[in-house]
Structures are given as C-alpha cells and as structure tokens.
C-alpha cells in the first residue's frame, strides 16, 4: 500500500483531522484509553510513536508495523498535522527487524526511526521519550510539557483509518499467549467475550489456569472470562493458577502490607532499579514502604511522590529479593491521595549516570518471571472471527461514560454510533462492532445480538 496521502486528506485542517478522530471513537490503545482527539489538540515539536511493546509476551505492535507499515506512516503524518509537529519519530526495538525493513523505505522527510534496546520498561512513555529524544518529562507533568505527544502503534493505525475512511474503532488486535494450544495474535470485534478469544487459541493447556489481561508485568488479573474485549484490552495471558504471577495478583492488600512489614531488608534495591527514579524523579519506593509499614515520619512531598509511580512493576518482579510489592503499596497510597484530591509538584533531579545500564534486559526478565516454558511467538492471524453477540462497555476510555443513543430492539449496523458522551465531556463514542439487534442496555453496557 502506498504512503501517498490522497489529495482530500492532504487538504484537511488540524481541526478536521481531530474531528474525524473524535467521531471514530479513537482512544489510546496502549494505556488507559485517553481520547486521541484531545491528545492531538496539543501543539508540540515531536510526535512520537511508542512501538517498544516491552511486555515480553505481547506480539501485537511489532507485527502490525510490518503488516500495515504504509498506513502507520500516514497516521504519523496526520498526527503531525494535527499537533503541528515538525518531526515524527517511530521508536521500536532493534529485534523488530521485519518492521524496520518494512518501514525504512517508506519514511518521508521529517519522520525517522529510533532504535531502542531490548530492555524493560522501554515502552514506559516517559522512558521512551527520554531514550528517543533526550528530553525528560518532570514528575506529574505531561509529555506535551517537553514538546512531545505520544501514541502507540494501534492508536496511530486507528487515526489513519478514521481520517481516510471515517472508519470507527470496532476491532482490537491482541495476543493470546502462555499455556494455550495455539498462541496467536488476532483481530477481534470489540465486545467479544474473553472466553471466545481463548477458544481461538485452542483453549488452556493446564487444568487450573489463571488469566491476565495484558502483559505479565502490568496486566491485571481476570476474574471472569465472560468479560468483553474493549478498546484497551492488551492481550490474554494464560498461566497455571499456581504460577507466582497469578498468586501475587491474588494477594489481598492486608497480606501485601503484612509481608512488607515482616521481611523488608532495608536494601533499597527497589529504588535503585526504579525507572522513574533513575531518570531523576523523586519517587523512592523503599522510603514509601518504610513510611507506610513502619509509620516512619515522611514529608508530605515524599508521600505525594507515590502519585508519580507508573506501576511498571520492576520493584516487585525484579528488584526485591524477598517478595515485597512496593508497587502495590504505591497503588494503595495513590488511591488514598487521589480521594483527597492531592497533587504532586516536585523537582526533576539529574538522571542517574547508570540509568541506561539498570533497565532490565527482556531475556533476563522472562527468566526472572518464570515465563520461559510459556514464551511463544504468537504469529499474526489475519482472518477475523465471527461472533453472535457482543457486549459494548460504555466506558472504554478515560472520562465520562458514553450514553446509549439506541433502544432495545433497534437494529444496528457495524460502525454505527450506539453511544456517545455528553457534549463537552471528556470521552469517546462507542460503535457497534457487528450487524444485529440491541438486546439489552444497562448503565455499564449495550448488548448486540447478531440477527
């Protein structure tokens, strides 16, 4: 497919691009689902595609890049127009050779590749910006504060579809990996159940499986396979329920605190390896653990620094030698501080001279996590599955829930807007992912049955 932009799209203004992106319901596919049209309002110098995909079991972005290289480049161009960026950067790992080979001959002036090392968490937005541009984002600040806007690969592809075809977000590409018969990466209708997604991979190969939504480091425990795929579903990771990654996620907060209080060795490795601390943020997990578990005096600013934790999980899964989870403790602190409407304003200190050498090699991470027996390539399958029912959650994004604009019994078509946020509210519209009939509407979701 050519990278040449149609004359109609070339003539679109920044406002017109953002409106098409809004109407298509594009949200950040790699994170919390921040509405893309709002992010594209920032006027910056650099538009950065975060293509690191540093969670070791996920294989989505690295395969979409070579499969849809031309569309990705055009998506970057549209985003650059919307943000006024003079430079576009696609940051990806050297091991993604097929993607590099596909993208390199397509790059126009003003767009370049930046090759990242195979380390974790290279895909942490703040780390990606630092490694790809040399700019450091201050604690609690947005990337736009240093002249950068960041989106991931799937988001940029959705931007291109929205601009060129006015095609709404009705599909999600995700990886099913781990203890499954046929690991794969597949594009599915939004609203398809995770149980059906698991079946596409031939089901679990262990008798008592546990499930993680996303990658092994930052993904959350899945409590029901009846949950639907959303715009932000990162993947489906299947492991024995006895695996430490599942068992840790099953620990309640009282247990997390009790373990920390009982076995902490005061070694401060969690801080020495904290990626945010390494690039100059005040965040010091070992001091926060002390403050919470041992009721030691701590400055208000130190406690507030918990709000800057990215929850990358290096402290728990790599650094701590005795099984403490500073990340879970930070998460508890963040919840309490946000309930009090607290905000952090702290300094950006000099980066640690050893920062680049203290990031975690992914091969070492796989071994450390006990994932070597379950690590699979998960090749991309181009055929899309057909489903008989979808459950479309009304809040698949940061901001207000969308409000249904259809009624039970109404016939809808794929791509039709079935819910939208109130005028002026932060959020994104929701679109039907199959042709069918609305069978149920609740405050949380719309159900569509094929027919």
From Swiss-Prot:
GO cellular component entries: membrane; propanediol degradation polyhedral organelle
Keyword Iron belongs to the record: yes
Binding site for [4Fe-4S] cluster 2: 309, 312, 315, 320
Subcellular location: Bacterial microcompartment
4Fe-4S ferredoxin-type domain location: 255-284, 300-330
InterPro entries: 4Fe4S_Fe-S-bd, Helical_ferredxn, Ion_transpt_RnfC/RsxC, Nuo51_FMN-bd, Nuo51_FMN-bd_sf, PduS, RnfC_N, Soluble_ligand-bd
Cofactor note: Binds 2 [4Fe-4S] clusters. The two centers are coupled but must possess different redox potentials. Binds one FMN non-covalently per monomer.
UniProt entry tagged with the keyword Cell division: no
Binding site for [4Fe-4S] cluster 1: 264, 267, 270, 274
Pfam families: Complex1_51K, Fer4_17, RnfC_N, SLBB
Pathway entry: Polyol metabolism; 1,2-propanediol degradation
Record GO terms (molecular function): 4 iron, 4 sulfur cluster binding; electron transfer activity; FMN binding; metal ion binding
Complex formation: Monomeric when purified anaerobically, dimeric under aerobic conditions. Forms a complex with PduO. Interacts with PduT, probably via the N-terminus of PduS.
Miscellaneous notes: Bacterial microcompartments (BMC) 100-200 nm in cross section are formed during aerobic growth on minimal 1,2-PD-B12 or anaerobic growth on 1,2-PD-tetrathionate medium, but not during aerobic growth on glucose, anerobic growth on glucose or pyruvate-tetrathionate. BMCs can constitute up to 10% of total cell protein.
Similarity annotation: Belongs to the PduS cobalamin reductase family.
Record function comment: A protein that aids in conversion of cob(III)alamin to cob(II)alamin and then to cob(I)alamin in the bacterial microcompartment (BMC) dedicated to 1,2-propanediol (1,2-PD) degradation. The latter step requires PduO. No free cob(I)alamin is released, suggesting a complex is formed with PduO that finishes conversion to adenosylcobalamin. PduS and PduO allow regeneration of the adenosylcobalamin cofactor within the BMC. Another study showed reduction of cob(II)alamin to cob(I)alamin in the absence of PduO. Both reactions require NADH.
Name of the protein: Cobalamin reductase PduS
Gene label: pduS
């Amino acid at each position: 497919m050519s990278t040449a932009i149609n004359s109609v799209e070339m003539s679109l203004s920044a406002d017109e691009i953002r409106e098409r992106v809004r109407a298509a319901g594009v949200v950040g596919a790699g994170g919390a689902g921040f509405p893309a049209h709002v992010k594209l309002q920032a006027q910056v110098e650099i538009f950065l595609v975060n293509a690191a995909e540093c969670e070791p079991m996920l294989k989505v972005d690295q395969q979409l890049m070579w499969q849809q290289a031309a569309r990705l480049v055009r998506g970057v161009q549209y985003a650059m127009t919307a943000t006024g960026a003079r430079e576009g950067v696609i940051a990806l790992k050297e091991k993604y050779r097929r993607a590099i080979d596909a993208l390199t001959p397509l790059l126009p002036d003003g767009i370049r590749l930046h090759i990242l090392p195979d380390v974790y968490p290279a895909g942490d937005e703040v780390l990606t910006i630092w490694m790809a541009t040399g700019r450091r984002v201050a604690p609690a600040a947005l990337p736009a504060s240093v002249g950068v806007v960041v989106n991931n690969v799937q988001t940029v592809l959705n931007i291109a579809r929205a601009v060129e075809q006015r095609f709404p977000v009705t599909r999600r590409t995700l990886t099913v990996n781990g203890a499954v018969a046929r690991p794969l990466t597949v594009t599915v209708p939004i609203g398809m159940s995770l149980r059906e997604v698991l079946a596409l991979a031939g089901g679990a190969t262990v008798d008592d499986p546990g499930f993680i939504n996303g990658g092994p480091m930052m993904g959350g425990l899945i409590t029901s396979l009846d949950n639907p795929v959303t715009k932000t579903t990162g993947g489906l990771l299947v492991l024995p329920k006895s695996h430490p990654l599942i068992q840790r996620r099953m620990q309640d907060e009282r247990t997390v605190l009790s373990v920390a209080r009982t076995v902490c060795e005061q070694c401060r490795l969690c801080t020495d390896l904290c990626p945010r601390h390494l690039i100059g943020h005040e965040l010091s997990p070992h001091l926060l653990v002390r403050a919470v578990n041992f009721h030691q005096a701590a400055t208000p600013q130190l406690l507030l620094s918990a709000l800057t934790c990215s929850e990358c999980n290096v402290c728990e899964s790599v650094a701590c030698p005795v099984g403490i989870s500073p990340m879970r403790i930070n998460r508890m602190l963040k919840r309490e501080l946000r309930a009090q409407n607290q905000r952090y304003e702290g300094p950006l200190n000099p980066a640690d001279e050893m920062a680049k050498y203290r990031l975690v090699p992914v091969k070492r991470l796989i071994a450390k996590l006990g994932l070597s027996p379950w690590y699979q390539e998960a090749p991309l399958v181009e055929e899309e599955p057909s489903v008989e029912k979808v459950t479309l959650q009304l809040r698949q994004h940061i901001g207000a829930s969308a409000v249904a604009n259809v009624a039970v019994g109404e016939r809808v078509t794929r791509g039709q807007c079935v819910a939208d946020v109130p005028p002026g509210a932060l959020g994104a519209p929701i679109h039907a992912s199959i042709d069918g009939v609305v069978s149920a509407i609740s405050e949380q979701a719309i159900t569509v049955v094929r027919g």
